[in-house]
Regions:
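Solvent-exposed beta-hairpin/edge-strand motifs
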Residues: 38-49, 87-124, 179-203, 275-304, ...
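Short, solvent-exposed beta-strand/turn "edge" segments of beta-rich domains on protein surfaces
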Residues: 56, 67-83, 138-141, 178, ...
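Short, well-ordered beta-strand segments enriched in hydrophobic/aromatic residues
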Residues: 76-86, 189, 264-274, 333, ...
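N-terminal secretory signal peptides that target proteins for export/translocation
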Residues: 1-13
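Bacterial N-terminal signal peptides
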Residues: 14-28
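N-terminal, polar/Ser/Thr-rich
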Residues: 33-75, 196, 227-262, 301
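Surface-exposed, acidic/Ser/Thr-rich flexible loop segments
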Residues: 59, 128-208, 311-377
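C-terminal beta-strand-rich structural cap/linker in extracellular carbohydrate-active enzymes
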Residues: 213-241, 386-409
Length: 409
C-alpha cells in the first residue's frame, strides 16, 4: 500500500509520521528474479530446509556501525546513531532506507569530516520511508563517501514496557524488552538509566557509560541476521563508568595481501577512522607493521596526505584538523611488509603473525588453497584468490593467527 509522500528539506528537523504499512513487504521484482535464477538463492524451501546462499567474495563486511539508546520506558522510543558509507564513484547522495512500522523524529545528518550538518530529505516511500543525505562532495574514484545520522524511532513492537505484574512469567512493573533483527553490522545497545539486564541472547561485551548506563557491544562474524532480545528491569544498583575500549565501534580493517611466499613480502592495506583531536596524529599501524613504500590517502577526497617522522613514530598531516566529537579522518594506509613469519617449505605456505584490530583478512597468492586456520574465520574467493577473513570478538586487541596453504598442482 502506498503511503502519503511528503519531502522536508533541512539539516536538523523534528518530524512525525503516521504510516499505513503492509507488514510483509516483498523484495523488489528484479532482486527476486535474480535470486530465482541463481543456484545459490539463500533463504528457505517451503518445508523450512535451507537453500544454499551465495559464495563469499567480499574481503570485508561490517562497514556500518549502529548504536541504539533506549529512551524513557513506556515511550516506545529509541535514539539511533548510525555511521554509514557510499562507495559508488560520482555518487552525490547517500540513501538510508529505514524500516516500515517505525515513526521517525529528530533526524540530524552530519559530515564526519567537518562535524557540520548536511542537507537531507526525509520522505515516505512505498512500504516505508528513507533519508536522502546530500554528500558534501561527489564520491571520488578511490575514495568513500560517508555520513553520520542521528534519528529517533517510535516502535511499540520493538520496545515494550510492562506495567502489570505477572508472576507466571516473572514480570514486574517497569520491566522492559527490546527485540530487533540486527543484520550483520557492528552494534551497540544502551539501556535506560537505572536498568539492569535480566537477559540478552546474543554474546556481547558489557560496559557502563559515563552516564552510568549499561551498554552491549557486539558484532556478528557471519554478517547475517542477529535476532536480538533484551530483557531488563529497574534496579537500585548504582553503576559507575568502567574503563572500556569499544572494539566494535572501531572500524579498522587490515588486508594482508600475500606476495610470492619465497619473498616473505606482504602488501598491507589498512582503512580506519581517526578520532583523536589534533591535526597530525601518529599512524598506529607502523608500530607493529613497519612498511616500506608508505602511502596515506584521505578517503574523503582520495588525495594523498603528507607523512613525517616524529621520533620513533610517523605522523600524518590531516586535511581538516579534528576539534569535536562528531569529526574523524577516514584514512587508508598502504605499504609493503617484509615478514619472516611468512614462509614456504616445499608445497606448504605458512602465514604466522600477531594481528591487531577487529577485522583482518589474509589474501593468499593465486594458486594456493587453505589447509588450516588457527582462529575462527570465514573463507571466500576474491578475483580467483582464496582469502581468510577474521573478526575478533575478544576484548584483547591482538591475537596470533597461523594460516597454512597448499599449492595447486
Amino acid at each position: 500500500m502506498k503511503t502519503h509522500l511528503r519531502t522536508i528539506r533541512c539539516p536538523s528537523i523534528t518530524i512525525r509520521w503516521l504510516l499505513v504499512l503492509t507488514l510483509g513487504a516483498a523484495l523488489p521484482t528484479a532482486v527476486t528474479a535474480q535470486r530465482a535464477d541463481s543456484p545459490f538463492p539463500g533463504g528457505e524451501n517451503p518445508d523450512g530446509s535451507l537453500r544454499p546462499s551465495a559464495r563469499l567474495t567480499r574481503l570485508f563486511t561490517q562497514d556500518a556501525y549502529t548504536e541504539y539508546t533506549l529512551l524513557e520506558p513506556g515511550s516506545d522510543k529509541f535514539r539511533i546513531r548510525y555511521f554509514t558509507e557510499e562507495r559508488r564513484p560520482g555518487a552525490t547522495e547517500l540513501v538510508n532506507g529505514t524500516r516500515g512500522g517505525s515513526e521517525g523524529t529528530d533526524i540530524e545528518v552530519y559530515d564526519p569530516r567537518t562535524g557540520k550538518p548536511l542537507p537531507f530529505t526525509y520522505q515516505a516511500e512505498d512500504g516505508g520511508h528513507a533519508i536522502h543525505a546530500r554528500l558534501p562532495r561527489p564520491v571520488p574514484k578511490g575514495g568513500i563517501g560517508r555520513v553520520l545520522i542521528y534519528k529517533t524511532y517510535e516502535d511499540a513492537r520493538t520496545y515494550q514496557s510492562y506495567d502489570k505484574a505477572d508472576a507466571r512469567h516473572d514480570i514486574r512493573p517497569g520491566d522492559i524488552t527490546w527485540v530487533r533483527s540486527l543484520a550483520g553490522y557492528r552494534r551497540g545497545v544502551i539501556l535506560p538509566k537505572g536498568y539492569a539486564f535480566l537477559s540478552s541472547n546474543v554474546a556481547a561485551h558489557v560496559s557502563t557509560t559515563s552516564t552510568g548506563q549499561l551498554e552491549l557491544h557486539f558484532a556478528n562474524p557471519s554478517g547475517l541476521s542477529n535476532p536480538l532480545t533484551i530483557h531488563a528491569r529497574p534496579t537500585t544498583a548504582t553503576f559507575t563508568p568502567t574503563p572500556y575500549t569499544d572494539i566494535f565501534f572501531d572500524d579498522v580493517k587490515t588486508l594482508y595481501d600475500l606476495g610470492a611466499p619465497e619473498s616473505h613480502t606482504i602488501r598491507v592495506d589498512q582503512i580506519y577512522s581517526e578520532y583523536r583531536k589534533g591535526s597530525t596524529p601518529t599512524l598506529p599501524l607502523l608500530g607493529y607493521a613497519p612498511l616500506s613504500d608508505l602511502r596515506v590517502i584521505d578517503l574523503d577526497t582520495a588525495k594523498p596526505l603528507e607523512t613525517s617522522a616524529s621520533g620513533a613514530a610517523t605522523t600524518v598531516a590531516l586535511g581538516v584538523p579534528i576539534v569535536d566529537d562528531r569529526q574523524s579522518a577516514h584514512l587508508e594506509i598502504t605499504g609493503t611488509l617484509s615478514d619472516p613469519g611468512y614462509t614456504v617449505a616445499g608445497d606448504m605456505l605458512k602465514f604466522d603473525r600477531t594481528v591487531k584490530g577487529l577485522r583482518n583478512t589474509i589474501l593468499l597468492p593465486e594458486g594456493w588453497e587453505v589447509a588450516s586456520v588457527s582462529q575462527a574465520a570465514t573463507i571466500g574467493v576474491h578475483e580467483g584468490r582464496v582469502f581468510v577473513a577474521l573478526i575478533n570478538l575478544n576484548a584483547e586487541n591482538q591475537y596470533r593467527v597461523v594460516v597454512t596453504a597448499k599449492r595447486r598442482s
